[in-house]
Amino acid sequence: MRSGGRMPESVLLLSGGIDSATLAYTHRPDLTVTVDYGQCCVDAEIQASAQIANQLNLEHEVIEVDCKNLGAGTMAGQQETDLGDAPEWWPYRNQLVITLVAMDVVHRGAHRLLIGAVADDQSHADGKAEFFELMDSLLSFQEGDLRVTAPAIDKTTEEFVREADPPESLLGWTHSCTKSNAACGECRSCKKRQRVLTRVY
């Protein structure tokens, strides 16, 4: 859904997970965007993101670019690769989705792209603080001066949720499974989601 010509100053990459949902609650961006890049759990991500945006009265859009044949690991429905240290590792995934969102919003007046990355999700190189600093430098160097920021990168998910205190009903919409549209309850992301919600609420 397009935002009706409105010029978004701040844009949130909304995956439908706990971290980006909490960031939507704390920062109330002008626009939220979910990217369908061919991941196996995309239907649930889009549904969760739409419900989160609706509850917070935020604009929500979906970008579709099928890159499944370039993916790897459980998120692409394929075998994991030795290059990554987790079964869901997808090469250059965060670089891909950030670039796709940036391409869509930079010419519409956006100046800040918010990413829901946290301290305890830095097992992949593209989840580390250094990565987001490099992406910020890369995008701001180019036309449009779009900045990338990960406001919760120094906090764990549990710390971030406790500090932000979003309503449980909001996080109830979230979907974190990296294997399917129905939460498997067994992958790292499902277990983390359940652990955080149990401890906080």
Where are these regions (language model features)?
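Nucleotide-activated chemistry modules centered on ATP-dependent adenylation/adenylyltransferase
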Residues: R2-Y201
